[in-house]
């Protein structure tokens, strides 16, 4: 597949066995039409054990070892179907318009270092059941304008050491029924 500034490109590597044709039978116009495996250049996945697997696996250029490769593999074994994508280093995905993901069961995501998410417009997140967030060290949250929190039932907040609350202007607190305050030592209130 070849066109003006588009098409499929895969340059043969040194040592590969190629299939050569000749334009109009002219030996001065050789054309590589394909490549084949041989005893020294075997497929990336063992056969016949992995006969249900197909895909593309490249090798890193000079200086890379056997385990250095980019790969896209399809496993079509009934009950074990899988699409496996491996980037030897970076992976960059660009979507010019919308992107949709659907996962029929569970999803697990692990990031060994940092993550940055930048949403330039609105964001909506819905969890139909429970949510648990665990933060190993500190957390900072900044809201540029207003914040509203609605809790349908009870709320429990526990602070292990100190807590400081600063309100720049007014504060209104309404308790629909009873309120109990327990202070282990001193309390100081200053008005004005």
Over which residues does each language-model region extend?
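Structural signature for extended repeat/solenoid scaffolds and their inter-repeat hinge/linker regions
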Residues: 1-192
């Amino acid at each position: 597949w070849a066109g003006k500034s588009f098409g499929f490109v895969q340059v043969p590597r040194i040592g590969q066995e190629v299939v050569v044709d000749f334009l109009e039978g002219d030996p001065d116009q050789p054309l590589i039409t394909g490549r084949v495996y041989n005893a020294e250049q075997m497929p990336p996945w063992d056969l016949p054990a992995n006969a249900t697997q197909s895909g593309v696996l490249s090798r890193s250029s000079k200086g890379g070892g056997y385990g250095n490769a980019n790969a896209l593999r399809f496993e079509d074994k009934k009950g074990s179907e899988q699409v496996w994508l491996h980037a030897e280093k970076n992976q960059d995905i660009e979507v010019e318009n919308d992107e949709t993901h659907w996962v029929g069961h569970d999803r697990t995501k692990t990031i060994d270092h940092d993550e940055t998410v930048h949403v330039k417009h609105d964001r909506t997140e819905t969890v139909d059941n429970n949510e648990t967030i665990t933060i190993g060290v500190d957390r900072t949250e900044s809201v540029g304008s207003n914040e509203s929190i609605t809790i349908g039932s009870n709320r429990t907040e526990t602070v292990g050491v100190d807590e400081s609350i600063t309100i720049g202007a007014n504060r209104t607190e309404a308790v629909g029924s009873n309120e109990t305050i327990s202070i282990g030592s001193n309390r100081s209130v200053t008005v004005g």
